[in-house]
Amino acid sequence: MSFIDIKNLKVHYPIRGGFFNRIVDHVYAVDGVDLTIEKGKTYGLVGESGSGKSTIGKAIIGLEKIKDGTITYEGKVIEKRRSRKSDYNQNIQMIFQDSLSSLNPKKRIIDIIAEPLRNFENLTDNEERKRVSELLEIVGMTDDAAEDRKSVV
């Protein structure tokens, strides 16, 4: 069983025009995408500007309304945002393309990295510090960077 399975995903935006501002056409931002994501693997979605990469990501996390298709999470169809389980919201998140504008420059690096750990894990201070250190090492940063502000990095 796949972690996330997307079948025939369609996200369309209406084009309005005329005197009464009626829908005259649609922009087919995503039209019939199939995608399978296995648990524990890392994926990248690559394409030209305007090809629908961000729209697919936003549809997966519920920020875009889906015109058609299904998104299945661990065998369960995710239909409406309200029906999504908290474990789905904990496990499915989006990393923004422009990390410099999406991170708070007043926060220390340790606080930025530890925020999801604090929200979704029950770690002691020592366990949290150790996990942050492991995560810093993965991206090639030292423990010294943990106390820096985002604006310094």
Which role does the model predict for each range below?
Residues 46-48:
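The feature captures the beta-strand-to-loop junction immediately N-terminal to the Walker
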